[in-house]
């Protein structure tokens, strides 16, 4: 790293150590700092409120407690924590170049961002895998409730293990009287160990899961399209069921694409800096970093907006959650969307209809757990 750089050493989920963030010692005008503060404050508020509402909608309503939705809760929790504990604190550090938050929080900030990003993207991957099994291999056993909890716990444990090396080498230093939170990696020949760690982390928290999801959703899309061609037409409730599956897949594809777009420039920034360190000596680099960091962190606030726009149950949930606002008026239909449970006879008839249409090759009974047709409470809601 060039001598002109004041290193801010919080890794923001990029897999590259934070002492490569490249924030220069140049201070910004007060008006500029005020604009950036407003932008980051808006991001944090929208992300925290939106993801907290998503978690409430799912956990507070039995009809919404499904396998897929539990992964959405995991995703929302990671995004909420990322916005609350990483975006705000790292913005303060990046804009002031002084670490105000103590040694313990320095360790936490070099552990949690990679952990949260890993949890976010692998929760999306788990959703893609669940949809793949439900739609492409409907006769295969589905995740049970204990299995879902085990997958979520496994995601968090692997994420913590992946982030641990950076946390382990974190330390507090003083540079010209200013406290810094740095990652003091051990010296080796040419920094090969550090570069290898960077590449492994970027591959695991970005490129690999995106490739897996691209393949999964491509196969899902082809499968659903094949069921829509002439000769394989579904009708009535089964047509609506098929359309609901398509809409859910489109929603999750949009979530994944948004995540990929938001994080790609940030990863490229660090990759470029690894091979061309003098870019951090330019005066404009602080503004570039703050813009790329804001774009990456903004990925935490888009998912609730996407759910609200594309899923009518989440839309009803948001109306109920914000009913205290004068411009929001929830209806009885909104309450029914989240609380209504079909009668036993309705569920039996629905399962019977799915079985008939599946045997004819039209609609797969995707709401199956361990090979059995499930009730709305136990299954995966694919309705829009």
Curated annotation (Swiss-Prot):
GO biological process: positive regulation of flagellated sperm motility; regulation of uterine smooth muscle contraction
PROSITE patterns, A to Z: G_PROTEIN_RECEP_F1_1, G_PROTEIN_RECEP_F1_2
Location relative to the cell: Cell membrane
Positions bearing carbohydrate: 11, 19
Pfam families for the chain: 7tm_1 (PF00001)
Segments traversing the membrane: 33-56, 70-90, 108-129, 150-170, 197-218, 252-272, 291-310
Lipidation (S-palmitoyl cysteine): 324
Disulfide links within the chain: 106-181
Keyword vocabulary terms for this entry: Cell membrane, Disulfide bond, G-protein coupled receptor, Glycoprotein, Lipoprotein, Membrane, Palmitate, Receptor, Transducer, Transmembrane, Transmembrane helix
Superkingdom of this protein's organism: Eukaryota
Topology feature Extracellular, residues: 1-32, 91-107, 171-196, 273-290
Cytoplasmic topological domain: 57-69, 130-149, 219-251, 311-384
InterPro entries membership: GPCR_Rhodpsn, GPCR_Rhodpsn_7TM, Neurokn_rcpt, NK2_rcpt
Keyword DNA repair attributed: no
Gene3D superfamilies: Rhodopsin 7-helix transmembrane proteins (1.20.1070.10)
UniProt KW Cell cycle keyword: no
Molecular function terms from GO: substance K receptor activity
Membrane topology summary: Multi-pass membrane protein
One Gene Ontology CC term in the entry: sperm midpiece
Main subcellular location of this protein, as a coarse class: membrane
General function of this protein: This is a receptor for the tachykinin neuropeptide substance K (neurokinin A). It is associated with G proteins that activate a phosphatidylinositol-calcium second messenger system. The rank order of affinity of this receptor to tachykinins is: substance K > neuromedin-K > substance P.
Family: Belongs to the G-protein coupled receptor 1 family.
PANTHER family, A to Z: G-PROTEIN COUPLED RECEPTOR TKR-1-RELATED, SUBSTANCE-K RECEPTOR
Protein name according to UniProt: Substance-K receptor
């Amino acid at each position: 790293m060039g001598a002109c750089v004041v290193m801010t050493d919080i890794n923001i989920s990029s897999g590259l150590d934070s002492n490569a963030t490249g924030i220069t010692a140049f201070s910004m005008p007060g008006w500029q700092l005020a604009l950036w503060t407003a932008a980051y404050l808006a991001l944090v508020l929208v992300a925290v409120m939106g993801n907290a509402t998503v978690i409430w909608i799912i956990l507070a309503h039995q009809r919404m407690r499904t396998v897929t939705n539990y992964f959405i809760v995991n995703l929302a929790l990671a995004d909420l924590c990322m916005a609350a504990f990483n975006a705000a604190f790292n913005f303060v550090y990046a804009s002031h170049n002084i670490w105000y938050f103590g040694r313990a929080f320095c360790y936490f900030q070099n552990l949690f961002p990679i952990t949260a990003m890993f949890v976010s993207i692998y929760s999306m991957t788990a959703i893609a895998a669940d949809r793949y099994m439900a739609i492409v291999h409907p006769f295969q056993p589905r995740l049970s409730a204990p299995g879902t909890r085990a997958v979520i716990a496994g995601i968090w444990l692997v994420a913590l293990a992946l982030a641990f090396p950076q946390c382990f080498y974190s330390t507090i230093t003083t540079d010209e009287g200013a406290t810094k939170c740095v990652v003091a990696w051990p010296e080796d020949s040419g920094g090969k160990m550090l570069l290898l760690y960077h590449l492994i982390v970027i591959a695991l928290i970005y490129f690999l899961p995106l490739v897996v999801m691209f393949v999964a959703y491509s196969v899902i899309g082809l499968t659903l399209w094949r069921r829509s061609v002439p000769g394989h037409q579904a009708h009535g409730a089964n047509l609506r069921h098929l359309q609901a599956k398509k809409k859910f897949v489109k929603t999750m594809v949009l979530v994944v694409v948004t995540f990929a777009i938001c994080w790609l420039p940030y990863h490229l920034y660090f990759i470029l800096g690894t091979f061309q360190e003098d870019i951090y000596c330019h005066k404009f680099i602080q503004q570039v970093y703050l813009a790329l960091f804001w774009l990456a962190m903004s990925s935490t606030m888009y998912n609730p907006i996407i759910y609200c726009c594309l899923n009518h149950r989440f839309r009803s949930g948001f109306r109920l959650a914000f009913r205290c606002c004068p411009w929001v008026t929830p209806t009885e239909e909104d309450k029914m969307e989240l609380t209504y449970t079909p009668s036993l006879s309705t569920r039996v008839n629905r399962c019977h209809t799915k079985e008939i249409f599946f045997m004819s090759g039209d609609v797969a009974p995707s709401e199956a757990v361990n090979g059995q047709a499930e009730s709305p409470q136990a299954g995966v809601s694919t309705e829009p």
